Amino acid sequence: MPVITMKQLLEAGVHFGHRTRRWNPKMAPYIYGARKGIYIIDLQKTLKLVEEACDFVKSKASEGATMIFVGTKKQAQHVVKEEAGKCGAFYVNNRWLGGLITNFKTIKPRIDKLIELEEMEKNGELAKLPKKEQSRLRKALEKLRKNLGGLKAMDRIPDIIYVIDPRKERIAVAEANKMGIPVIGVVDTNCDPDPVDFVIPANDDAIRSIKLITSKIAEAYLEGREGVSFTEETPSEPIQSDSSEEEEGSLDISDLFEDTDLKEEE
Protein backbone atom coordinates (compact mmCIF):
# COMPACT_ATOMS: atom_id res chain seq x y z
CA MET A 1 0.00 0.00 0.00
CA PRO A 2 1.31 3.50 -0.77
CA VAL A 3 2.47 5.74 2.05
CA ILE A 4 0.88 8.76 0.39
CA THR A 5 -1.38 9.42 -2.59
CA MET A 6 -1.21 11.83 -5.49
CA LYS A 7 -4.57 13.26 -4.44
CA GLN A 8 -3.21 14.11 -0.99
CA LEU A 9 -0.17 15.83 -2.48
CA LEU A 10 -2.32 17.93 -4.81
CA GLU A 11 -4.85 18.89 -2.15
CA ALA A 12 -2.06 20.02 0.19
CA GLY A 13 -0.45 22.19 -2.48
CA VAL A 14 2.81 20.26 -2.34
CA HIS A 15 3.40 21.04 -6.03
CA PHE A 16 3.76 24.81 -5.66
CA GLY A 17 7.40 25.90 -5.89
CA HIS A 18 8.83 29.41 -5.61
CA ARG A 19 8.69 32.09 -8.28
CA THR A 20 10.96 31.35 -11.21
CA ARG A 21 13.29 34.23 -10.34
CA ARG A 22 13.95 32.58 -6.97
CA TRP A 23 15.24 29.13 -7.78
CA ASN A 24 18.27 26.91 -7.49
CA PRO A 25 19.22 25.29 -10.83
CA LYS A 26 20.16 22.11 -8.95
CA MET A 27 16.44 21.56 -8.36
CA ALA A 28 15.77 21.32 -12.11
CA PRO A 29 15.43 17.49 -12.06
CA TYR A 30 12.53 17.82 -9.62
CA ILE A 31 10.60 20.50 -11.52
CA TYR A 32 7.66 19.64 -13.78
CA GLY A 33 7.46 23.03 -15.46
CA ALA A 34 6.55 26.65 -14.89
CA ARG A 35 3.54 28.84 -15.50
CA LYS A 36 2.60 32.35 -14.45
CA GLY A 37 6.09 32.79 -13.03
CA ILE A 38 5.84 29.93 -10.54
CA TYR A 39 7.61 26.59 -10.69
CA ILE A 40 5.57 23.41 -10.39
CA ILE A 41 7.22 20.51 -8.59
CA ASP A 42 7.03 17.09 -10.26
CA LEU A 43 4.75 15.21 -7.87
CA GLN A 44 5.49 11.90 -9.52
CA LYS A 45 9.03 12.26 -8.18
CA THR A 46 7.81 13.57 -4.83
CA LEU A 47 5.59 10.51 -4.48
CA LYS A 48 8.51 8.16 -5.11
CA LEU A 49 10.94 10.04 -2.88
CA VAL A 50 8.51 10.24 0.05
CA GLU A 51 8.17 6.46 -0.18
CA GLU A 52 11.96 6.03 -0.19
CA ALA A 53 12.45 8.35 2.77
CA CYS A 54 9.70 6.63 4.77
CA ASP A 55 11.12 3.19 4.01
CA PHE A 56 14.53 4.36 5.25
CA VAL A 57 13.08 5.88 8.43
CA LYS A 58 10.99 2.81 9.17
CA SER A 59 13.95 0.47 8.67
CA LYS A 60 16.29 2.51 10.87
CA ALA A 61 13.66 3.03 13.56
CA SER A 62 13.12 -0.74 13.76
CA GLU A 63 16.83 -1.00 14.59
CA GLY A 64 16.49 1.51 17.42
CA ALA A 65 17.66 4.65 15.60
CA THR A 66 16.84 8.02 17.14
CA MET A 67 15.60 10.95 15.08
CA ILE A 68 15.29 14.71 15.36
CA PHE A 69 12.75 16.89 13.52
CA VAL A 70 13.94 20.42 12.70
CA GLY A 71 11.67 23.22 11.52
CA THR A 72 12.14 26.72 12.91
CA LYS A 73 10.21 28.74 10.32
CA LYS A 74 6.85 30.01 11.55
CA GLN A 75 4.79 27.69 9.34
CA ALA A 76 6.66 24.61 10.59
CA GLN A 77 6.96 25.22 14.33
CA HIS A 78 3.65 23.77 15.51
CA VAL A 79 3.72 20.89 13.02
CA VAL A 80 7.22 19.83 14.06
CA LYS A 81 6.34 19.84 17.76
CA GLU A 82 3.07 17.99 17.22
CA GLU A 83 4.35 15.28 14.87
CA ALA A 84 7.57 14.67 16.80
CA GLY A 85 5.48 14.30 19.93
CA LYS A 86 3.24 11.73 18.27
CA CYS A 87 6.10 9.47 17.24
CA GLY A 88 8.53 10.02 20.11
CA ALA A 89 11.20 11.86 18.10
CA PHE A 90 13.25 14.80 19.33
CA TYR A 91 12.58 18.22 17.83
CA VAL A 92 13.89 21.77 17.43
CA ASN A 93 11.26 24.33 16.43
CA ASN A 94 12.60 27.64 17.71
CA ARG A 95 16.33 28.02 17.11
CA TRP A 96 19.08 25.57 16.23
CA LEU A 97 21.87 25.98 18.76
CA GLY A 98 25.25 25.81 17.05
CA GLY A 99 27.14 22.69 18.10
CA LEU A 100 24.00 20.73 18.95
CA ILE A 101 25.33 17.83 16.91
CA THR A 102 29.02 18.62 16.42
CA ASN A 103 29.65 19.59 20.05
CA PHE A 104 26.84 17.92 21.97
CA LYS A 105 28.87 17.76 25.18
CA THR A 106 28.50 21.54 25.54
CA ILE A 107 24.74 21.41 24.94
CA LYS A 108 23.97 18.50 27.28
CA PRO A 109 24.58 20.53 30.48
CA ARG A 110 21.93 23.01 29.30
CA ILE A 111 19.47 20.17 28.77
CA ASP A 112 20.28 18.91 32.27
CA LYS A 113 19.70 22.42 33.64
CA LEU A 114 16.30 22.55 31.95
CA ILE A 115 15.32 19.25 33.55
CA GLU A 116 16.56 20.49 36.95
CA LEU A 117 14.58 23.74 36.76
CA GLU A 118 11.42 21.96 35.64
CA GLU A 119 11.73 19.61 38.60
CA MET A 120 12.16 22.60 40.93
CA GLU A 121 9.04 24.17 39.44
CA LYS A 122 7.08 20.94 39.76
CA ASN A 123 7.94 20.20 43.39
CA GLY A 124 7.48 23.81 44.54
CA GLU A 125 11.13 24.57 45.30
CA LEU A 126 11.16 27.43 42.80
CA ALA A 127 8.23 29.16 44.52
CA LYS A 128 10.09 29.14 47.86
CA LEU A 129 12.98 31.22 46.54
CA PRO A 130 13.22 35.02 46.90
CA LYS A 131 11.23 36.84 44.22
CA LYS A 132 14.31 38.20 42.48
CA GLU A 133 15.88 34.75 42.25
CA GLN A 134 12.56 33.26 41.17
CA SER A 135 12.27 35.78 38.35
CA ARG A 136 15.81 35.08 37.15
CA LEU A 137 15.34 31.32 37.14
CA ARG A 138 11.91 31.47 35.52
CA LYS A 139 13.32 33.56 32.67
CA ALA A 140 16.13 31.04 32.26
CA LEU A 141 13.61 28.20 32.32
CA GLU A 142 11.45 29.86 29.66
CA LYS A 143 14.44 30.35 27.37
CA LEU A 144 15.68 26.79 27.86
CA ARG A 145 12.21 25.37 27.18
CA LYS A 146 11.92 27.37 23.98
CA ASN A 147 15.25 26.18 22.58
CA LEU A 148 15.69 22.75 24.17
CA GLY A 149 12.20 21.62 25.19
CA GLY A 150 12.12 19.01 22.45
CA LEU A 151 15.48 17.51 23.43
CA LYS A 152 15.03 16.63 27.11
CA ALA A 153 15.32 12.89 26.52
CA MET A 154 18.28 13.18 24.13
CA ASP A 155 21.45 11.82 25.72
CA ARG A 156 23.47 11.41 22.51
CA ILE A 157 23.45 12.79 18.98
CA PRO A 158 20.58 11.51 16.80
CA ASP A 159 20.94 8.90 14.07
CA ILE A 160 18.69 10.70 11.55
CA ILE A 161 17.80 14.35 11.02
CA TYR A 162 14.63 15.52 9.25
CA VAL A 163 14.53 19.17 8.21
CA ILE A 164 11.92 21.43 6.69
CA ASP A 165 13.71 23.88 4.38
CA PRO A 166 17.43 22.96 4.38
CA ARG A 167 18.19 26.49 3.19
CA LYS A 168 16.91 27.97 6.43
CA GLU A 169 18.25 25.07 8.51
CA ARG A 170 21.65 25.12 6.80
CA ILE A 171 23.60 25.04 10.09
CA ALA A 172 21.77 21.92 11.24
CA VAL A 173 22.31 20.29 7.84
CA ALA A 174 26.01 21.21 7.82
CA GLU A 175 26.50 19.73 11.29
CA ALA A 176 24.73 16.53 10.28
CA ASN A 177 26.87 16.28 7.13
CA LYS A 178 30.03 16.73 9.19
CA MET A 179 29.02 13.97 11.60
CA GLY A 180 27.84 11.59 8.87
CA ILE A 181 24.20 11.70 9.97
CA PRO A 182 21.68 11.06 7.16
CA VAL A 183 19.58 14.11 6.31
CA ILE A 184 15.98 13.88 5.10
CA GLY A 185 14.71 17.21 3.83
CA VAL A 186 11.59 18.89 2.49
CA VAL A 187 13.30 20.77 -0.34
CA ASP A 188 11.63 23.60 -2.28
CA THR A 189 12.72 24.94 -5.67
CA ASN A 190 14.94 27.63 -4.12
CA CYS A 191 17.09 25.16 -2.15
CA ASP A 192 20.35 23.33 -2.84
CA PRO A 193 19.52 19.61 -2.65
CA ASP A 194 23.17 18.45 -2.58
CA PRO A 195 23.65 18.36 1.23
CA VAL A 196 20.44 16.35 1.65
CA ASP A 197 20.65 12.55 1.51
CA PHE A 198 16.92 11.97 1.03
CA VAL A 199 15.41 14.84 -0.95
CA ILE A 200 11.64 15.29 -0.78
CA PRO A 201 10.83 17.98 -3.38
CA ALA A 202 7.86 19.87 -1.97
CA ASN A 203 6.36 23.21 -1.03
CA ASP A 204 8.13 24.07 2.24
CA ASP A 205 6.09 27.22 2.92
CA ALA A 206 2.45 26.08 3.05
CA ILE A 207 1.36 24.61 6.38
CA ARG A 208 -0.76 21.91 4.72
CA SER A 209 2.18 20.71 2.66
CA ILE A 210 4.53 20.70 5.65
CA LYS A 211 1.94 18.89 7.76
CA LEU A 212 1.31 16.18 5.17
CA ILE A 213 4.96 15.30 4.53
CA THR A 214 5.98 15.55 8.19
CA SER A 215 3.09 13.38 9.34
CA LYS A 216 4.14 10.64 6.92
CA ILE A 217 7.73 10.73 8.19
CA ALA A 218 6.42 10.60 11.77
CA GLU A 219 4.17 7.65 10.96
CA ALA A 220 7.07 5.79 9.37
CA TYR A 221 9.21 6.38 12.46
CA LEU A 222 6.46 5.19 14.78
CA GLU A 223 5.74 2.19 12.59
CA GLY A 224 9.40 1.22 12.70
CA ARG A 225 9.54 1.59 16.47
CA GLU A 226 6.25 -0.09 17.31
CA GLY A 227 5.14 -1.98 14.23
CA VAL A 228 1.99 0.13 13.72
CA SER A 229 0.91 0.45 10.08
CA PHE A 230 -0.37 3.78 8.71
CA THR A 231 -0.18 3.11 4.96
CA GLU A 232 -2.98 4.39 2.74
CA GLU A 233 -5.43 1.95 1.21
CA THR A 234 -6.38 4.36 -1.56
CA PRO A 235 -4.29 3.78 -4.71
CA SER A 236 -2.21 6.69 -5.96
CA GLU A 237 -3.20 8.61 -9.07
CA PRO A 238 -0.05 8.95 -11.17
CA ILE A 239 0.90 11.96 -13.27
CA GLN A 240 2.68 11.22 -16.53
CA SER A 241 5.49 13.76 -16.75
CA ASP A 242 9.19 13.87 -17.41
CA SER A 243 9.65 17.43 -18.67
CA SER A 244 7.99 20.84 -18.78
CA GLU A 245 6.15 19.84 -21.97
CA GLU A 246 2.70 18.34 -21.59
CA GLU A 247 2.20 14.86 -22.99
CA GLU A 248 -0.89 12.88 -23.86
CA GLY A 249 -2.54 11.70 -20.66
CA SER A 250 -0.58 14.08 -18.43
CA LEU A 251 -2.04 16.49 -15.91
CA ASP A 252 -2.95 19.89 -17.37
CA ILE A 253 -0.46 22.16 -15.67
CA SER A 254 -2.90 25.08 -15.71
CA ASP A 255 -5.16 23.17 -13.34
CA LEU A 256 -2.48 23.30 -10.68
CA PHE A 257 -2.88 27.04 -10.14
CA GLU A 258 -6.44 27.06 -8.88
CA ASP A 259 -5.36 27.53 -5.24
CA THR A 260 -2.38 29.85 -5.43
CA ASP A 261 -2.85 30.84 -1.80
CA LEU A 262 -1.41 27.47 -0.85
CA LYS A 263 2.04 28.96 -1.38
CA GLU A 264 2.71 30.97 1.76
CA GLU A 265 6.12 32.47 1.09
CA GLU A 266 7.87 34.33 3.87
UniProtKB/Swiss-Prot annotation:
GO molecular function, one term: structural constituent of ribosome
GO CC annotation: cytosolic small ribosomal subunit
Keywords for the protein's UniProt record, in alphabetical order: Ribonucleoprotein, Ribosomal protein
Biased composition regions of type Acidic residues, renumbered to the chain: 243-266
Region (Disordered): 227-266
Keyword Ribosomal protein: yes
InterPro entries assigned to the protein according to its UniProt record, in alphabetical order: Ribosomal_uS2, Ribosomal_uS2_bac/mit/plastid, Ribosomal_uS2_CS, Ribosomal_uS2_flav_dom_sf
Gene Ontology biological-process entries: translation
A Pfam family the protein falls into: Ribosomal_S2
Biased composition annotated in UniProt, kind: Polar residues: 231-240
Family matches, as PROSITE patterns: RIBOSOMAL_S2_1
Family indicated by similarity: Belongs to the universal ribosomal protein uS2 family.
NCBIfam families in alphabetical order: rpsB_bact
HAMAP family, per database record: Ribosomal_uS2_B (MF_00291_B)
Record's protein name: Small ribosomal subunit protein uS2
Annotated source species: Pseudothermotoga lettingae (strain ATCC BAA-301 / DSM 14385 / NBRC 107922 / TMO) (Thermotoga lettingae)
Lineage of source species: Bacteria, Thermotogati, Thermotogota, Thermotogae, Thermotogales
